């Protein structure tokens, strides 16, 4: 919640190319929901005849590929079963549901040594970071935060994320922006992080 007042709604709308949030939801509620609620997205749909010309036939098969972003207290396996149960309750028990990949949700407390070292490293570089409890995206952090390791894990980097996936999405060889490190500065930031961890 403390990061919300520092995030600019107008800049975010411009970057995302949107004029309003889902259901005209207020900005604050949208950000809280982004970090605390699961999502289900349709990645693609295929059905019926898609070749050249036309065919007056009923499709015998349809395919939907979805992704579900999980939050704490959910598991990938349980979520797949809940999707199957929902479809069955709605009369679509004949739909086959397969999980082709995925992982459980992950979370590391903001007061953990790792997150505090990341914040200290950003501040050393002159950046006052926003610390979000979760990302809208997904990454296999549960590999580290879940059993058997149960280690803190997070995403860090002074590289150029370009709003895509991560702060080290790709590196600039040299950067003219003081808030975005070039390749050498990005590499040094990880050294600084290791020293901050002690």
Which residues does each PLM region occupy?
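A glycine-rich phosphate-binding loop feature that marks nucleotide/adenosyl-phosphate handling sites
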Residues: 1-4, 101-102, 135-143
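Short secondary-structure junctions
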Residues: 38-39, 90-94, 122-128
């Amino acid at each position: 919640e403390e990061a919300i007042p520092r995030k600019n709604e107008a800049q975010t709308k411009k970057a995302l190319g949107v004029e309003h949030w889902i259901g005209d939801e207020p900005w604050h509620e949208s950000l809280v929901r982004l970090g605390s609620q699961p999502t289900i997205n349709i990645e693609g749909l295929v059905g019926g005849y898609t070749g050249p010309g036309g065919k007056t036939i009923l499709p015998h098969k349809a395919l939907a590929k979805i992704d579900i972003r999980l939050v704490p207290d959910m598991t990938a396996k349980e979520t797949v079963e809940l999707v199957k149960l929902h479809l069955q309750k709605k009369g679509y028990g004949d739909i086959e549901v397969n999980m082709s990949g995925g992982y459980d949700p992950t979370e590391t407390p903001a007061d953990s040594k790792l997150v505090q070292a990341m914040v200290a490293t950003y501040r050393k570089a002159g950046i006052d970071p926003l610390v979000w409890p979760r990302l809208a995206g997904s990454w296999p952090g549960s590999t580290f935060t879940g059993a058997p390791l149960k280690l803190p894990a997070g995403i860090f980097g002074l590289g150029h994320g370009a709003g895509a996936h991560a702060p080290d999405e790709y590196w600039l060889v040299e950067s003219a922006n003081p808030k975005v490190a070039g390749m050498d500065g990005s590499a040094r930031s990880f050294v600084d992080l290791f020293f901050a961890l002690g």
